[in-house]
Amino acid sequence: MILFEDIFNRAVNLFDDPDIRRAYELNPVEFSQTMRPYLINGLGMFANPTTVSSRFSDYTEAQGKLEVFDGDGGATYTLSTVPVDNSVMSFFIGKTPDPLAEYDPTTQKVTFSTNVPVGTRCSCEWYYAGEFKADFTGFSSNISPSFIASRTKDILAHCLLLGWAENEKNFMLDIRGILTDTDFKLHSPANSVRAKTEWYQNIREGLNDLTQKLSWDLWSGAIGGRQIGK
């Protein structure tokens, strides 16, 4: 099993862009909602090794809920829904993000970092992006499933970015929307990503390197260990 969020967490570092990271940190729910279709669309770029890539057709659907409260002068409010395990959460006081707010699953309570004035709305949104039901058993006995899963997360992160690169213009409009909604602005459109051609080529080469390494690891493990499957 591989959580979509684990892939998002790796992918955000590959963007190497402060504005994207700020969107990721300030509004993780909307960021994950934006990322999800690029991950799904990028799956087709994971072609080899087929013994691994063929295991990603089964994944769960996304779930989420937005809850809005009328401020009563306090900082703590109770959710009426139970967030799905491994969900990300975004908190707002009015239209201002509150990344320091906390959720206590034992009490179902959200505590904002400051008291919410009477008449001001605050909100908590949780979002579970999904997970791949991939099973990495059945390979050589000296290659652990956790090793294959880790390699695969890096591959999928690169696939996500390549899927994004095909729609860069629309994606950056989405990112601008996230930042605008939270009273933050992009410093400069030129800062959005590195020179597009070079950046795209680096990600493409990175994907090729990762898939080749995984293929080699599986082959060398099968030769060097007791093979229990293909």
Model regions and ranges:
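Conserved short "hinge" loops at termini or chain/domain junctions
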Residues: M1-E67, D72, T76-T78, P83-S87, ...
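Amphipathic alpha-helical interaction surfaces
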Residues: M45-N48, V52, L162-N170
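Elongated alpha-helical scaffolds
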Residues: A149-K169
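Short, surface-exposed beta-strand/strand-loop-strand elements in extracellular ectodomains
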Residues: M172-I178
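Eukaryote-specific, cytoplasm-facing alpha-helical/coiled-coil scaffolding segments in long proteins
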Residues: T182-S192
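Glycine-rich, aromatic-bearing surface loops/beta-hairpins
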Residues: N191-N202
